[in-house]
């Protein structure tokens, strides 16, 4: 029997055993718990939003240990956003540092699949009274956890598209040397258009470049156990981006079966579930385990072979299982990277190297390694808010257009010139008198013209004699008035302002491409509906004609084809028909008996049918095969017809496959049950089954069916008609205190996880201890509350009855 494993990892995952505190007497536990519960609700459920007149609060999305998030509408534009309120943000150093870290990271990232900061509200109170931080984020209706564990249809195309967006955002994040460390379905925000964004960067860290940074990496590590990588559980001291790829693999498997892949109830059970599927770790991994007793425990277990993924997910897509197997490996170096996963054949449908950017420059975590006080963290957060608004104001000034106004210079008005009439004789085209010489001017002529009217000369002055056919004074006055009006309008429009440079072409982003694809999909669906309507109308007419004159023999009837495809197939059918033989010469006329009927020699096979005559191309048999090959290749579809998309089974079908931990150590208890996620073979699609045809060319009928399918095929998964409301966990508000405390105090704590209801395991004791640090609670109160709600360390092994210390 394997030696019982004692606790080797502390609450921060660093390997130090946590200190033991004596339990409080039983008769005082109820009063302490009631006091702590009242304090938690009073400090956490503060949903009063003071956002001024710019935003209008709609409803509360969710609340948690770190804040409250509500949906809102911007009054000026009507745009809907999510506003996250972090109350008492500077009371606890851990929470204040988490807020600073998340603000810095989200300001650094600009990606379509990562939640973005739209605004940070400026403090409206003096610095000394500033306590709550308001962050305006993208509004997403739901999260992936709610989608998976609901009745919402989730097809293979949905899984493929969600996984592609997750890996696309992860590639961008990893290129900035950032590890998320807390990827789980509830932290992946989703909307009804199947768009996915990664949220909650409060646990993010940078890459470890030296062994001295391992302790920094594991500090405050309270990620959900079900998605935690083996190197974190075994203290392998190899903390790379592969940690996130393990979490992605667990999420991928959960989407395929709509059930958690490794729902461990405690530390040992989690290791057992992983080894039941992946087998015993390699000797190199076992030797790299940092804790001696953990290494001895694994070595004492009987060797186990890995289970094929086809057995775990029967009937699932082979390419999907191939990618899943490359994500879930014990060795971190053997796991596939996010960039390589995007190139996997399973995601080839969406992969576009030009639309999968990297982040430059890398994010700097130097501030996170410093020992900061609450006052310094508050100053840093205020500086981040001011920097955000300074950058946004600078961008607005760059795109603002203000024409410069300059005074108009004056100059002498040019003397009037007599303009001859166009109908005057050619000899009269010469001017009446040569133009007078302009007075010399030392200054250069200004660029502008004085448009002020000069006073008219006195009427007593003698006008020059007019020639026959010259333009009258009234005409010249009208022309001058028109010219003056034109010049005034040009000056009024700003001729002195510099010409506006042509707007540079904006780069096409993934969101714009997504909108273009959705618009194309909408137009395709409308065209498909129109074609379907015309097809039904044509079938109705054909049925009516068949009732009157017999059934229709058109092999293309009832198919949705474009005009070009239909003309191409008709041409191919004509080319495939054998050429008619030349008519034989008529024999010499001979007298025939008057009683004989005239006969004719048939030029081809005579049909035995007594029905009406049919064209030669429609007579089945060997004679109907094409005699000569067509001049071009047969039109083929771009790829094989995809299998019909199936909806993953509901959780009720998996109730009998519950993963029950063994009552004792491996090898001494009940037989272990492998995780089994039945999905069944995909049912045949009647729309894709080729129907028998009487056409003489079966390949023509097959091509017709394939082209008909290609006319309505949609490359994107169908949008959700309605999405379940999210819990707000993806916005970084922490676990839901209302639900957690109600379950803990009112209903008691269940023996095991409730499938489909929560995607979080027991949290670290440091989470509550840090949260209550500034609220005047003594260690006895904290210990009593921890024991009541069972918020034990994720590495605590003493909660198993069969793993007590000797």
UniProtKB/Swiss-Prot annotation:
| Keywords annotated in UniProt | Acetylation, ATP-binding, Cell cycle, Cytoplasm, Differentiation, Kinase, Nucleotide-binding, Nucleus, Phosphoprotein, Serine/threonine-protein kinase, Transferase
According to the UniProt entry, which residues carry Phosphoserine? Answer: 710
- The UniProt annotation places ATP binding at 61-69, 84
Modifications after synthesis and translation? Dually phosphorylated on Thr-219 and Tyr-221, which activates the enzyme.
Q: Compositional bias (Pro residues) spans?
A: 433-443, 578-592, 627-643, 678-689
Q: What is its EC number?
A: 2.7.11.24
Can you name this protein?
Mitogen-activated protein kinase 7
- Name the active site residues: 182
Native organism: Mus musculus
Q: What is known of its domains?
A: The second proline-rich region may interact with actin targeting the kinase to a specific location in the cell.
Q: How does it assemble?
A: Interacts with MAP2K5. Forms oligomers. Interacts with MEF2A, MEF2C and MEF2D; the interaction phosphorylates the MEF2s and enhances transcriptional activity of MEF2A, MEF2C but not MEF2D. Interacts with SGK1. Interacts with PML. Interacts (via N-terminal half) with HSP90AB1-CDC37 chaperone complex in resting cells; the interaction is MAP2K5-independent and prevents MAPK7 from ubiquitination and proteasomal degradation. Interacts with STUB1/CHIP; the interaction is enhanced in the presence of IGF1 or MAP2K5 and promotes STUB1/CHIP E3 ligase activity.
- Family per record: Belongs to the protein kinase superfamily. CMGC Ser/Thr protein kinase family. MAP kinase subfamily.
